[in-house]
A protein has these predicted regions:
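N-terminal "arm"/small-domain region of PLP-dependent enzymes with the aminotransferase-like
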Residues: 1-59, 137-138, 342
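Phosphate-binding glycine-rich loop
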Residues: 54-92, 110
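Active-site phosphate-binding strand-loop segment of PLP-dependent enzymes
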Residues: 121-179
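PLP-dependent aminotransferase class I/II
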Residues: 193-271, 277-278
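Conserved PLP-binding catalytic core of the aspartate aminotransferase-like
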Residues: 258-259, 272-303
C-alpha cells in the first residue's frame, strides 16, 4: 500500500515550523534565540520532540523511537491524523458504534463525512456487513477501539477487517494495559496503513498530564510531527511523565490492584437483582444493564456517586469505572439501598 497517496496534498507540501534551537545539539548554552524570559522556573520552551521520553517508551514497548509520536492526549493524536489524511467535505471516516464519542466530534470539526456500522450483539465487528458496505463505499480512514469504550470488550476480528479494508486504520488501545489480549503493536510491520493509539491517562494514572501516544511507520510519524503544534507537551508534564516511566513496576502493581477490584465489583454486582447483565470487560470499567438506567443514575448522584449513563448508546446501561476498594464498597452499599426502593 502506497501510504504517500493517502496524505493530503497540502500536508505533503507543508514546510513545518522549525525553531532556531532545533539546529543546536546539546543541553548547555546561552539561549538568545526564542525571545524567552531569562528568569523563572519554566522559562524555556520544552523539547518539541520529547526525545528523552521517546527513548524510554521505545525501551518499554520494544519499538524504534522513530515509530513514536506524542500528543497532548490521545484526542490530539486522532485530530492530527484526521488533518493529515482526511480532506474536509470530501473524505470519509468509518466508525463502529457504540464507541468513543470523540471520534465523531473530531470528524465533525474536521468536516469529514461519517459512516457508521454498528457492532453486532456481541459487540464485535460484523465482518460480512462491513464487506458488503465496502463494495459500494470506500472510506479513507477507519477507527477501531479495542478494548472498546463503552462496552469494555476486546475486538477479536481486527485482522479480518484489515484484510478487507483499503485505507488508513487507527486502532485505539487506550485500555490495552488491562486486557488479556495482546497489543497490535507487534503487527505494525505487516500493516503500514495502521496507526496504534495508546495513552498514559488510564493504566499509568496520568489523566491530568494529558499525554497520548501513536505508533506507526516513520513516514506517518514524520507527517504527524510536521502537523502538530511545536511545543504540544509542556515541560512540567514531560518531567512528570519521565519520572513515571522510570518506575514501570509500580504501574504494573497498580494495574493488578485495579483488576482485583474489578473482580470484586463484578462479583458484588452479580448479587443485585435489578442488574440484568454484566458485560465481559478487558478494561478498567464495567458496563452493566439495569432495569432503569436513568432512575438509578439519578439516585446514585444523591449519595453522591457519579457513574456514566450510557442509556443513549445502549438501552438501560451504566458504565462504572473501577475505583478504589473503599469507593466500590460505598457504591455497593448505596446500590443495595436503591434495590430496596425499586
Amino acid at each position: 500500500m502506497d501510504i504517500q497517496s493517502y496524505i493530503k496534498d497540502n500536508v505533503k507540501n507543508l514546510i513545518p515550523y522549525s525553531s532556531a534551537r532545533s539546529e543546536f545539539k546539546g543541553n548547555e548554552g546561552i539561549f538568545l534565540d526564542a525571545n524567552e524570559n531569562p528568569y523563572g522556573i519554566y522559562n524555556r520552551y520544552p523539547d518539541p520532540y520529547q526525545k528523552n521520553i521517546k527513548k524510554k517508551i521505545a525501551e518499554l514497548k520494544q519499538i524504534p523511537e522513530n515509530h513514536i509520536f506524542l500528543g497532548n492526549g490521545s484526542d490530539e493524536v486522532l485530530d492530527v491524523l484526521m488533518r493529515i489524511f482526511l480532506e474536509p467535505k470530501q473524505d470519509s471516516l468509518l466508525i463502529f458504534p457504540p464507541t468513543y464519542g470523540m471520534y465523531e466530534v473530531l470528524a465533525n470539526i474536521n468536516q469529514v463525512k461519517i459512516y457508521k456500522i454498528s457492532l453486532n450483539l456481541d459487540f464485535q465487528l460484523p465482518i460480512q456487513e462491513i464487506n458488503n458496505f465496502l463494495k459500494n463505499e470506500q472510506p479513507k480512514m477507519a477507527i477501531l477501539c479495542s478494548p472498546n469504550n463503552p462496552t469494555g470488550n476486546s475486538l477479536e476480528n481486527i485482522s479480518e477487517f484489515l484484510d478487507i479494508f483499503r485505507g488508513i486504520v487507527v486502532i485505539d488501545e487506550a485500555y490495552i494495559d488491562f486486557s488479556k489480549q495482546p497489543s497490535f503493536l507487534s503487527y505494525l510491520s505487516q500493516y503500514p496503513n495502521v496507526i496504534i493509539s495508546q495513552t498514559f491517562s488510564k493504566a499509568w494514572g496520568l489523566a491530568g498530564v494529558r499525554v497520548g501516544m501513536a505508533f506507526a511507520n516513520p513516514l506517518i510519524i514524520n507527517y504527524m510531527n510536521a502537523v502538530k503544534y511545536p511545543y504540544n507537551i509542556s515541560l512540567p508534564n514531560q518531567q512528570i511523565l519521565e519520572k513515571s516511566l522510570n518506575n514501570p513496576k509500580k504501574v504494573q502493581k497498580e494495574i493488578q490492584r485495579i483488576l482485583e477490584n474489578r473482580d470484586f465489583l463484578i462479583s458484588e454486582l452479580a448479587k443485585i437483582p435489578w442488574v440484568k447483565n454484566i458485560y465481559p470487560t478487558d478494561a478498567n470499567f464495567v458496563l452493566i444493564e439495569v432495569e432503569d438506567a436513568n432512575f438509578i443514575y439519578q439516585k446514585l448522584l444523591e449519595y453522591p456517586i457519579v457513574v456514566r449513563n450510557r442509556h443513549s448508546q445502549i438501552p438501560n446501561t451504566l458504565r462504572i469505572t473501577i475505583g478504589k476498594k473503599s469507593e466500590l464498597k460505598k457504591l455497593i452499599k448505596e446500590i443495595k439501598n436503591i434495590n430496596k426502593s425499586l
